[in-house]
């Protein structure tokens, strides 16, 4: 089914207000969830909203909390989220990273005691739209086995890198081949994943999303490489924020909250003039896109470029929402 932006936002806000979230905060939060869904990140927009409400009801998310600055070292700052709403806090932290970058050329904000930020790509995109290179990542609950193991000991720890090209070029990826949100999307659509998503109970690679959702044996992105990347991202976020690690969140909390996040903005225009920047970026993009495709009907594309098309289509024709997801939202 398809719904309008306003209808979707209205449902989000209705649910938030019914949970006694303050009106202005409910409006802002509903807007971000609607924006995320309209942009095509369904797995971390409308699909994720019931989980967000569950954590709100459990007290993991404190809707009226506000982040505070703990430490300032020029271009680097350390903040405490106090378990505030994750996507609203992340937006503020990338804004702060850009403010620091405008003063220093680069801005780094490390955040502790944060909640799930939903679609991490929103914050990289936020920076790139204003001409900055945006980089951010978060640690998470241990929901993936390290390479060679059966038990979950590392997080999917999404990493985002956004470059201010036209359209914006952005990598938004978890350290697993698929996030649990994307596994849900595939399962709801009744299809297998395009590549191996994890391991079955007999240690064989599988493309069945339901199997991996159940046994929690995600495939790390690039096998041992994704496993290693998850570990070092966790270490850096923990150290820069003086916050909780994946191990601490998993062992000491009863759910995924109080995670650690890093937001980086780079004012590239201080390093290169606009004309030269555009020429260099266009050459890179043209060189990649003109590679001969394996399938003539599937032209080579750059990461993130599809979101511009998806957003335009969803604005014009309505936002696709799975029937079961919509029913669940209406029941909240």
UniProtKB/Swiss-Prot annotation:
Its main location: cytoplasm. NAD(+) binds at residues 168-174, 224-225, 304-306. It holds the Pfam family Ldh_2. It is found in: Cytoplasm. Homodimer. Catalyzes the reduction of 2,3-diketo-L-gulonate in the presence of NADH, to form 3-keto-L-gulonate. NCBIfam families: PRK13260.1. This is 2,3-diketo-L-gulonate reductase. The lineage of its organism: Bacteria, Pseudomonadati, Pseudomonadota, Gammaproteobacteria, Pasteurellales. The gene is dlgD.
């Amino acid at each position: 089914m398809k719904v309008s932006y306003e209808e979707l936002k209205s449902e989000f806000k209705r649910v938030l207000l019914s949970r006694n979230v303050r009106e202005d905060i409910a409006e802002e939060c509903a807007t971000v969830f609607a924006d995320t869904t309209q942009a095509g990140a369904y797995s971390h927009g409308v699909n994720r909203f019931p989980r967000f409400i569950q954590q709100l009801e459990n007290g993991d998310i404190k809707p009226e909390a506000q982040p505070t600055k703990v430490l300032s070292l020029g271009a680097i700052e350390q903040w405490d989220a106090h378990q505030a709403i994750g996507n609203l806090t992340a937006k503020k932290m990338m804004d702060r990273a850009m403010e620091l970058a405008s003063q220093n050329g680069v801005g780094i904000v490390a955040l502790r005691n944060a909640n799930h930020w939903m679609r991490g790509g929103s914050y990289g995109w936020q920076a790139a739209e204003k001409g900055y290179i945006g980089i951010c990542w978060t640690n998470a609950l241990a929901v993936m086995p390290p390479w060679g193991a059966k038990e979950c000991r590392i997080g999917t720890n999404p990493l985002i890198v956004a470059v201010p090209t036209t359209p914006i070029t952005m990598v938004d990826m978890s350290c697993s081949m698929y996030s649990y949100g994307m596994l849900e999307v595939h399962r709801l659509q009744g299809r297998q994943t395009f590549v191996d998503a994890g391991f079955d109970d007999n240690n064989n690679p599988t493309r069945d999303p339901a199997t991996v959702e159940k046994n929690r044996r995600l495939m790390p992105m690039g096998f041992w490489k994704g496993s290693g990347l998850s570990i070092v991202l966790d270490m850096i976020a923990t150290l820069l924020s003086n916050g909780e690690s994946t191990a601490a969140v998993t062992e000491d909390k009863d759910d995924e909250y109080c995670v650690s996040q890093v937001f980086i903005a780079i004012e590239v225009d201080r390093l290169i003039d606009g004309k030269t920047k555009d020429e260099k970026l266009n050459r890179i993009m043209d060189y990649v896109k003109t590679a001969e495709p394996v399938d003539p009907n599937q032209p080579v594309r750059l990461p993130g470029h599809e979101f511009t098309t998806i957003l335009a289509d969803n604005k014009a024709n309505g936002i696709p929402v799975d029937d079961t997801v919509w029913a669940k939202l209406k029941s909240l």
